[in-house]
Amino acid sequence: MPFEIVFDGAKDFADLIATASNLIDEAAFKITEEGISMRAMDPSRVVLIDLNLPESIFSKYEVEEEETVGINMDHFKKILKRGKNKDTLILRKGDENFLEITFEGTAKRTFRLPLIEVEELELDLPELPFTAKVVVLGEVLKEAVKDASLVSDALKFIARENEFIMKAEGETNEVEIKLTLEDEGLLDLEVEEETKSAYGISYLADMIKGIGKADEVIIRFGNEMPLQMEYPIRDEGKLIFLLAPRVED
Protein backbone atom coordinates (compact mmCIF):
# COMPACT_ATOMS: atom_id res chain seq x y z
CA MET A 1 0.00 0.00 0.00
CA PRO A 2 1.57 3.34 -1.12
CA PHE A 3 0.38 5.15 2.04
CA GLU A 4 -1.67 4.92 5.21
CA ILE A 5 -2.10 8.08 7.28
CA VAL A 6 -4.03 8.38 10.55
CA PHE A 7 -5.25 11.65 12.09
CA ASP A 8 -6.94 11.76 15.49
CA GLY A 9 -9.90 14.16 15.47
CA ALA A 10 -11.60 13.95 12.09
CA LYS A 11 -13.43 17.27 12.49
CA ASP A 12 -10.18 19.25 12.77
CA PHE A 13 -8.99 17.84 9.46
CA ALA A 14 -12.39 18.49 7.88
CA ASP A 15 -12.31 22.16 8.95
CA LEU A 16 -8.87 22.51 7.42
CA ILE A 17 -9.93 21.13 4.03
CA ALA A 18 -13.20 23.10 4.12
CA THR A 19 -11.27 26.35 4.58
CA ALA A 20 -9.04 25.66 1.57
CA SER A 21 -11.94 24.38 -0.56
CA ASN A 22 -13.72 27.73 -0.26
CA LEU A 23 -11.17 29.08 -2.73
CA ILE A 24 -10.07 26.17 -4.93
CA ASP A 25 -12.00 23.46 -6.78
CA GLU A 26 -9.19 20.93 -7.03
CA ALA A 27 -5.74 20.42 -5.57
CA ALA A 28 -2.61 18.31 -5.95
CA PHE A 29 -1.50 16.98 -2.56
CA LYS A 30 2.13 15.90 -2.35
CA ILE A 31 2.62 12.94 0.00
CA THR A 32 6.24 12.41 1.10
CA GLU A 33 8.04 10.80 4.03
CA GLU A 34 8.20 14.26 5.65
CA GLY A 35 4.47 15.00 5.47
CA ILE A 36 1.63 16.31 3.31
CA SER A 37 1.86 19.57 1.38
CA MET A 38 -0.30 21.44 -1.09
CA ARG A 39 0.09 24.77 -2.87
CA ALA A 40 -2.49 26.27 -5.21
CA MET A 41 -4.01 29.52 -6.48
CA ASP A 42 -7.67 30.38 -6.69
CA PRO A 43 -9.10 30.66 -10.24
CA SER A 44 -8.92 34.47 -10.17
CA ARG A 45 -5.23 34.30 -9.10
CA VAL A 46 -5.85 36.64 -6.18
CA VAL A 47 -5.14 34.16 -3.36
CA LEU A 48 -2.27 31.71 -2.94
CA ILE A 49 -2.94 28.77 -0.59
CA ASP A 50 -0.06 26.92 1.08
CA LEU A 51 -0.68 23.88 3.30
CA ASN A 52 2.02 22.05 5.23
CA LEU A 53 1.27 19.10 7.52
CA PRO A 54 4.44 17.43 8.87
CA GLU A 55 4.29 13.71 9.62
CA SER A 56 4.68 14.47 13.36
CA ILE A 57 1.08 15.73 13.70
CA PHE A 58 -0.33 12.36 12.60
CA SER A 59 -0.73 9.41 14.97
CA LYS A 60 0.37 7.05 12.18
CA TYR A 61 2.21 7.98 9.02
CA GLU A 62 3.39 5.28 6.62
CA VAL A 63 4.42 6.28 3.10
CA GLU A 64 6.13 3.81 0.76
CA GLU A 65 7.16 6.37 -1.85
CA GLU A 66 6.61 10.01 -2.71
CA GLU A 67 3.34 10.52 -4.55
CA THR A 68 1.10 13.36 -5.74
CA VAL A 69 -2.65 12.81 -5.60
CA GLY A 70 -5.20 15.01 -7.36
CA ILE A 71 -8.40 15.61 -5.42
CA ASN A 72 -11.74 17.29 -6.12
CA MET A 73 -11.91 19.57 -3.08
CA ASP A 74 -15.70 19.86 -2.95
CA HIS A 75 -16.17 16.08 -2.91
CA PHE A 76 -13.36 15.69 -0.34
CA LYS A 77 -14.93 18.36 1.88
CA LYS A 78 -18.38 16.76 1.78
CA ILE A 79 -17.00 13.35 2.77
CA LEU A 80 -14.84 14.78 5.58
CA LYS A 81 -17.84 16.64 7.00
CA ARG A 82 -19.31 13.22 7.84
CA GLY A 83 -16.61 12.74 10.48
CA LYS A 84 -17.40 13.37 14.13
CA ASN A 85 -15.26 15.13 16.73
CA LYS A 86 -13.96 11.94 18.33
CA ASP A 87 -13.64 9.92 15.12
CA THR A 88 -10.22 8.81 13.95
CA LEU A 89 -9.58 9.63 10.29
CA ILE A 90 -7.64 7.15 8.16
CA LEU A 91 -6.46 8.01 4.64
CA ARG A 92 -5.25 5.11 2.50
CA LYS A 93 -4.21 4.66 -1.10
CA GLY A 94 -3.41 1.30 -2.63
CA ASP A 95 -2.53 0.50 -6.22
CA GLU A 96 -5.92 1.65 -7.53
CA ASN A 97 -6.63 5.28 -8.38
CA PHE A 98 -8.82 5.91 -5.34
CA LEU A 99 -8.35 7.61 -1.98
CA GLU A 100 -9.91 5.52 0.77
CA ILE A 101 -11.30 7.66 3.60
CA THR A 102 -12.26 5.83 6.79
CA PHE A 103 -13.85 7.16 9.97
CA GLU A 104 -13.41 4.99 13.06
CA GLY A 105 -15.69 5.82 15.98
CA THR A 106 -18.88 4.11 17.09
CA ALA A 107 -18.68 2.31 13.73
CA LYS A 108 -16.21 2.04 10.86
CA ARG A 109 -17.34 4.01 7.79
CA THR A 110 -15.32 3.96 4.58
CA PHE A 111 -15.65 6.15 1.48
CA ARG A 112 -13.74 5.75 -1.79
CA LEU A 113 -12.97 8.99 -3.62
CA PRO A 114 -11.73 8.76 -7.24
CA LEU A 115 -8.48 10.66 -7.78
CA ILE A 116 -8.26 13.13 -10.64
CA GLU A 117 -5.59 14.62 -12.88
CA VAL A 118 -4.57 18.04 -11.56
CA GLU A 119 -2.03 20.30 -13.23
CA GLU A 120 0.88 20.91 -10.87
CA LEU A 121 1.91 24.55 -11.01
CA GLU A 122 5.32 25.76 -9.88
CA LEU A 123 4.22 28.28 -7.27
CA ASP A 124 6.58 30.02 -4.87
CA LEU A 125 5.55 31.47 -1.53
CA PRO A 126 7.46 34.77 -1.69
CA GLU A 127 9.30 36.21 1.28
CA LEU A 128 7.93 39.73 1.51
CA PRO A 129 9.21 42.68 3.59
CA PHE A 130 6.17 42.89 5.87
CA THR A 131 6.18 45.79 8.34
CA ALA A 132 3.39 44.58 10.64
CA LYS A 133 2.63 41.30 12.40
CA VAL A 134 -0.67 40.87 14.26
CA VAL A 135 -1.92 37.83 16.18
CA VAL A 136 -5.68 37.83 16.85
CA LEU A 137 -8.35 35.41 17.95
CA GLY A 138 -10.44 33.93 15.17
CA GLU A 139 -13.60 35.39 16.72
CA VAL A 140 -12.28 38.94 16.30
CA LEU A 141 -11.50 38.43 12.64
CA LYS A 142 -14.78 36.68 11.85
CA GLU A 143 -16.84 39.43 13.51
CA ALA A 144 -14.82 42.20 11.85
CA VAL A 145 -15.38 40.72 8.38
CA LYS A 146 -19.11 40.35 9.07
CA ASP A 147 -19.33 43.95 10.31
CA ALA A 148 -17.37 45.31 7.36
CA SER A 149 -19.46 43.41 4.80
CA LEU A 150 -22.46 45.53 5.83
CA VAL A 151 -20.87 48.73 4.54
CA SER A 152 -18.22 47.92 1.92
CA ASP A 153 -16.53 45.29 -0.23
CA ALA A 154 -13.07 46.16 1.12
CA LEU A 155 -11.56 46.04 4.59
CA LYS A 156 -8.60 48.25 5.48
CA PHE A 157 -6.01 46.96 7.98
CA ILE A 158 -4.07 49.59 9.93
CA ALA A 159 -1.27 48.74 12.36
CA ARG A 160 0.38 51.29 14.61
CA GLU A 161 2.72 50.96 17.56
CA ASN A 162 -0.03 50.42 20.11
CA GLU A 163 -3.13 49.52 18.12
CA PHE A 164 -4.54 47.42 15.31
CA ILE A 165 -7.54 48.78 13.40
CA MET A 166 -9.83 47.18 10.84
CA LYS A 167 -11.94 49.73 9.00
CA ALA A 168 -14.51 49.72 6.19
CA GLU A 169 -16.05 52.78 4.56
CA GLY A 170 -19.14 52.89 2.37
CA GLU A 171 -20.88 55.75 0.59
CA THR A 172 -23.04 56.60 3.60
CA ASN A 173 -21.66 54.70 6.59
CA GLU A 174 -18.51 53.15 8.01
CA VAL A 175 -17.34 50.74 10.69
CA GLU A 176 -14.13 50.61 12.70
CA ILE A 177 -12.85 47.79 14.91
CA LYS A 178 -9.99 48.90 17.16
CA LEU A 179 -7.80 46.63 19.29
CA THR A 180 -4.94 47.23 21.70
CA LEU A 181 -2.89 44.68 23.63
CA GLU A 182 -5.18 45.32 26.59
CA ASP A 183 -8.01 43.66 24.63
CA GLU A 184 -8.42 39.89 24.89
CA GLY A 185 -8.78 39.54 21.14
CA LEU A 186 -5.32 40.93 20.29
CA LEU A 187 -2.62 38.48 21.36
CA ASP A 188 0.47 40.09 19.82
CA LEU A 189 1.42 43.17 17.83
CA GLU A 190 4.76 43.94 16.17
CA VAL A 191 4.97 47.08 14.03
CA GLU A 192 8.07 48.48 12.30
CA GLU A 193 6.19 51.50 10.94
CA GLU A 194 2.59 52.61 10.59
CA THR A 195 1.18 50.17 8.05
CA LYS A 196 -2.00 50.39 5.96
CA SER A 197 -3.48 48.18 3.27
CA ALA A 198 -6.95 47.18 2.04
CA TYR A 199 -8.23 43.74 1.00
CA GLY A 200 -11.34 42.32 -0.64
CA ILE A 201 -13.94 41.22 1.90
CA SER A 202 -15.27 38.33 -0.19
CA TYR A 203 -11.83 36.71 -0.22
CA LEU A 204 -11.28 37.35 3.49
CA ALA A 205 -14.66 35.77 4.24
CA ASP A 206 -13.68 32.60 2.36
CA MET A 207 -10.29 32.46 4.09
CA ILE A 208 -11.75 32.53 7.61
CA LYS A 209 -14.84 30.32 7.21
CA GLY A 210 -13.21 27.25 8.71
CA ILE A 211 -11.46 28.82 11.69
CA GLY A 212 -12.77 28.53 15.23
CA LYS A 213 -13.49 31.49 17.49
CA ALA A 214 -10.67 30.51 19.85
CA ASP A 215 -8.12 29.81 17.09
CA GLU A 216 -5.06 32.03 16.83
CA VAL A 217 -4.58 33.74 13.48
CA ILE A 218 -1.25 35.30 12.49
CA ILE A 219 -1.54 38.23 10.07
CA ARG A 220 1.41 39.87 8.31
CA PHE A 221 1.13 42.79 5.89
CA GLY A 222 2.88 45.88 4.56
CA ASN A 223 1.83 49.16 2.99
CA GLU A 224 -0.27 48.27 -0.08
CA MET A 225 1.26 44.79 -0.01
CA PRO A 226 -0.25 41.29 0.04
CA LEU A 227 -1.66 40.03 3.32
CA GLN A 228 -0.32 36.77 4.69
CA MET A 229 -2.74 34.94 6.98
CA GLU A 230 -1.47 31.88 8.84
CA TYR A 231 -3.31 29.30 10.93
CA PRO A 232 -1.06 27.10 13.08
CA ILE A 233 -2.18 23.45 13.03
CA ARG A 234 -1.32 21.39 16.11
CA ASP A 235 1.84 23.44 16.76
CA GLU A 236 3.90 22.18 13.82
CA GLY A 237 1.56 22.32 10.81
CA LYS A 238 0.23 25.45 9.14
CA LEU A 239 -2.20 26.72 6.54
CA ILE A 240 -1.18 29.99 4.88
CA PHE A 241 -3.12 32.31 2.59
CA LEU A 242 -1.45 35.11 0.63
CA LEU A 243 -4.04 37.66 -0.53
CA ALA A 244 -3.33 40.40 -3.07
CA PRO A 245 -4.14 43.93 -1.86
CA ARG A 246 -7.11 45.96 -3.02
CA VAL A 247 -5.58 48.96 -4.78
CA GLU A 248 -7.37 52.12 -3.71
CA ASP A 249 -8.02 55.05 -6.01
Swiss-Prot record:
Ranges in a coiled coil: none
CDD domains the UniProt entry points to: PCNA
Matches recorded under Pfam families: PCNA_C (PF02747), PCNA_N (PF00705)
Domain of life: Archaea
Entries under InterPro entries matching the protein: DNA_clamp_sf (IPR046938), Pr_cel_nuc_antig (IPR000730), Pr_cel_nuc_antig_C (IPR022649), Pr_cel_nuc_antig_CS (IPR022659), Pr_cel_nuc_antig_N (IPR022648)
UniProt GO molecular function: DNA binding; DNA polymerase processivity factor activity
Keyword terms, alphabetized: DNA replication, DNA-binding
A biological-process GO annotation: regulation of DNA replication
Quaternary structure annotation from Swiss-Prot or TrEMBL: Homotrimer. The subunits circularize to form a toroid; DNA passes through its center. Replication factor C (RFC) is required to load the toroid on the DNA.
NCBIfam families with a match to the protein in the record: pcna, PRK01115.1-2, PRK01115.1-4
Protein family: Belongs to the PCNA family.
Protein purpose: Sliding clamp subunit that acts as a moving platform for DNA processing. Responsible for tethering the catalytic subunit of DNA polymerase and other proteins to DNA during high-speed replication.
Protein's recorded name: DNA polymerase sliding clamp
Gene: pcn
